[in-house]
């Protein structure tokens, strides 16, 4: 099933496309929390620590996989909007072949080097064997991670975000069920958790392929898929590399801020951890709206409907603005209740409320930065998104260091450091946006 976003009222199209993306990400966040609870409750803190310490390496691999999938998705959206089904087939085929080779090579490398990589990360010796086993099992199934993300990204690029949501929900339910079976029933520990992840993603890959054969004729498997286009691969890599580096930059920025938070005491650390999870729930839909804008504008750009590209951008920014105001009201007014869902300590709740009420006052800023990034992704200028994200995180980390380490400010210093990053990010993006719109005024 595909969704031609070059026709119809734009605002309803964006909303209908965004809702499954939001639900999918919220479902993923909820699943991640459940996964940690199962390991921590039924295995113990050592297993939980082993799983946690393996996450940076897993995140690195997934960042590059997602980057390639996002890059390919933008190109697929553009080709689909132009009605060039042959180009869609070549793009999908080329990405599938290249992704398979990369996944298998990276998987083999990480399985072989799991022990020295974890030792390099200073993993304690008492949990090293647990972490090695967990990491090797997960990386052995990296090919399924690639195909699962690739097929879901391709369906979204064709305008079908609902199917991707359904498969994510199926994968998450299978994963949680597998965790309970392998960890609680069979007592396989963190290795059982890793095996559950691989099996659930493998089953979802099979379901995705069956669905595509049944519902998406443009992507039906056949000999024509065995086409490799070097020029398309280079273009995909250029798009994907920028996307992967952008996401990596965001992760590094979060790590830097966390390192500063770790100097502020246990109560502040706990409050920041809980409040950051809430902030993630609030922030994720803003990203999803931006990605929906990318798909809609890329399809219309490919179709040559430049008036709809501009309309899509303006409608998307209005949706971002409305959501930014609504979520700010919810987080500011409901901060005490929301914090009590995560923690019971009065001091931690008080600190978390101060964080949430401060950061929520500025939620319009990331709403607009995500909308602008969605625009630049749709026109293929991913360097802007990479540079702006890098600037944001550099200034955020630097501001946090100044506010906390030099000026000795309390927890409000952290959301204020976010604001510094967003302000500088907008100061970089807005002139480029105005320049692009003026230089392409005849088209838009």
Model-derived features: where do they sit?
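Transmembrane helical elements of multi-pass membrane transporters/channels
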Residues: 16-35, 137, 148, 171, ...
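Interfacial/gating helices of multi-pass transporter permease domains
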Residues: 39-59, 126-130, 190-193, 232-239, ...
């Amino acid at each position: 099933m595909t969704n031609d976003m070059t026709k119809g009222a734009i605002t309803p199209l964006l909303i209908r496309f965004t809702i499954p993306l939001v639900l999918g990400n919220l479902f993923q966040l909820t699943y991640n929390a459940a996964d940690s609870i199962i390991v921590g409750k039924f295995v113990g803190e050592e297993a939980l620590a082993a799983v946690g310490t393996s996450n940076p390496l897993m995140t690195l691999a997934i960042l590059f996989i997602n980057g390639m999938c996002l890059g390919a998705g933008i190109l697929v959206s553009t080709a689909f909007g132009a009605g060039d089904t042959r180009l869609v087939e070549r793009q999908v085929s080329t990405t599938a072949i290249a992704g398979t080779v990369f996944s298998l090579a990276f998987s083999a490398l990480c399985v072989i080097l799991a022990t020295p990589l974890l030792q390099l990360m200073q993993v304690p010796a008492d949990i090293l064997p647990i972490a090695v086993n967990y990491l090797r099992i997960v990386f052995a199934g990296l090919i399924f991670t690639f195909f699962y993300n690739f097929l879901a990204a391709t369906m979204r690029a064709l305008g079908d975000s609902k199917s991707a949501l359904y498969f994510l929900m199926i994968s998450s339910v299978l994963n949680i069920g597998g965790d309970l079976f392998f960890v609680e029933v069979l007592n396989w520990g963190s290795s059982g958790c890793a095996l559950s992840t691989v099996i659930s993603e493998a089953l979802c890959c099979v379901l995705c392929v069956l669905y595509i054969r049944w519902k998406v004729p443009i992507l039906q498997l056949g000999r024509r898929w065995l086409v490799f286009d070097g020029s398309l691969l280079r273009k995909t890599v250029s798009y994907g590399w920028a996307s992967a580096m952008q996401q990596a930059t965001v992760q590094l920025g979060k790590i830097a801020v966390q390192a500063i938070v770790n100097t502020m005491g246990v109560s502040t650390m706990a409050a920041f951890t809980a409040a950051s999870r809430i902030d993630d729930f609030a922030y994720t839909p803003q990203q999803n709206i931006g990605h929906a804008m990318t798909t809609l504008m890329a399809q219309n750009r490919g179709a040559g409907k430049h008036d709809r590209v501009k309309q899509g951008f303006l409608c998307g920014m209005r949706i971002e603005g409305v959501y930014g105001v609504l979520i700010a009201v919810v987080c500011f007014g409901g901060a005490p209740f929301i914090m009590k869902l995560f923690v019971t300590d009065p001091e931690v709740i008080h600190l978390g409320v101060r964080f949430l009420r401060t950061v929520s006052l500025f939620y319009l800023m990331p709403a607009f930065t995500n909308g602008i990034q969605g625009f630049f992704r749709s026109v293929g200028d991913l360097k802007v998104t990479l540079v702006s994200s890098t600037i944001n995180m550099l200034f955020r980390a630097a501001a946090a260091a100044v506010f906390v380490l030099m000026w000795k400010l309390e927890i409000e210093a952290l959301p204020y450091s976010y604001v510094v990053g967003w302000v500088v990010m907008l100061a970089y993006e807005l002139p480029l946006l105005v320049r692009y719109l003026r230089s392409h005024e005849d088209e838009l």
